[in-house]
Amino acid sequence: MAIDLFCYLSIDRGAAESDLNKIRSNHSELFEGKFLISPVRDADFSLKEIAAEHGLVAESFFLVSLNDKNSADLIPIVSKILVDGFNGGAILILQDNEYRR
């Protein structure tokens, strides 16, 4: 069973990449095997529509995928780390693009 966190950001791709690199570096114990992070990309029309349904104007987007099934209980912690790590903009995290984290 795949578990993905769909992460929508109100900041541009460059700022998001910078913040995400800091998060990866500060929490390498999570992001070097237990969870995999996709490259940040610009939010396209459909991604912007999904974010708008939840009250966010999305500029960028990335995925966090659970890579180690035994780490599923860490999903709330990973979500908190991401929220805290993006000080420059709002983040919307949807588990499997459906459930708000």
From Swiss-Prot:
Q: Which Gene3D superfamilies match?
A: 3.30.70.2920
Which segments does the entry list as coiled coil? none
Complex and partners: Specifically interacts with the truncated CT fragment of cognate toxin protein CdiA-2, which inhibits CdiA-2 tRNA nuclease activity.
Protein role: Immunity protein component of a toxin-immunity protein module, which functions as a cellular contact-dependent growth inhibition (CDI) system. CDI modules allow bacteria to communicate with and inhibit the growth of closely related neighboring bacteria in a contact-dependent fashion. Neutralizes the toxic activity of cognate toxin CdiA (C-terminal 301 residue CT fragment) upon expression in E.coli. Does not inhibit toxic activity of CdiA from other strains of B.pseudomallei. Expression of this cdiAIB locus in B.thailandensis confers protection against other bacteria carrying the locus; growth inhibition requires cellular contact.
Q: What is the protein's name according to its record? A: Immunity protein CdiI-2
Species of origin reads Burkholderia pseudomallei (strain 1026b)
**Which gene produces this protein?**
cdiI2
